């Protein structure tokens, strides 16, 4: 089971660049959508299976959040290049900056033996869900040229940026709070 869980994580690591190339070089938006959707689903399953079958590994714990960030950054850069929008670019900068900041906080807290200060919150899970839903909707909208889909995806990405700011502030407060 450990090998299967690691396979899922590694498949997510390589899916980000594949999604980017499919969408931006080959204009295969529907295939990019499907691979992105599969990556989002495997993000849930690799952690679930690892915990359920005691197949967690220290390498998996390191690679899993890296895979999340690679997929997110590749997809947001891809969408920015396809849309060429300052608005989407600005939201993407907020989202990516938050991911880097919180990763730094988590590393700091890990070194201090205080990992609970930045354990994943429910709000952060909603943030991730809105990011993934928005990105999937963008690729689906590209595939079928859905103007309403682009509008809704942009609004959901805006909500995701707000959640990114809120969770970054929460984690920052938790990290630097005395106790």
Segments predicted by a language model, with ranges:
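Short, amphipathic, aromatic/basic-enriched membrane-interface segments that mark the entry/exit
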Residues: 1-7, 58-64, 119
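A feature for the membrane-embedded catalytic helix bundles of lipid/isoprenoid biosynthetic enzymes
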Residues: 2, 13, 21, 34, ...
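Membrane-interface helix caps and helix-loop-helix hairpins in membrane proteins
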Residues: 26, 54-55
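N-terminal signal-anchor transmembrane alpha helix
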Residues: 8, 15-19
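Membrane-interface transmembrane helices that cradle and orient dolichyl/undecaprenyl
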Residues: 22-28
């Amino acid at each position: 089971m450990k090998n299967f869980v690691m396979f899922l994580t590694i498949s997510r690591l390589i899916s980000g660049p594949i999604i980017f190339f499919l969408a931006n070089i080959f204009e295969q938006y529907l295939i990019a959508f499907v691979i992105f959707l599969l990556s989002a689903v495997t993000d849930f399953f690799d952690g679930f299976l690892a915990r359920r079958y005691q197949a967690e590994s220290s390498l998996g714990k390191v690679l899993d959040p890296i895979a999340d960030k690679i997929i997110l950054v590749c997809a947001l850069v891809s969408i920015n290049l396809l849309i060429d929008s300052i608005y989407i670019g600005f939201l993407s900068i907020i989202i990516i900056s938050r991911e880097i900041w919180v990763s730094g906080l988590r590393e700091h807290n890990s070194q201090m033996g205080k990992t609970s200060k930045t354990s994943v919150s429910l709000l952060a899970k909603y943030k991730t869900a809105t990011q993934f839903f928005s990105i999937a909707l963008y690729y689906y909208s590209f595939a079928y040229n859905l103007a309403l889909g682009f509008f809704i995806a942009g609004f959901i990405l805006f909500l995701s940026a707000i959640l990114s700011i809120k969770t970054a502030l929460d984690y920052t407060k938790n990290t630097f709070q005395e106790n």
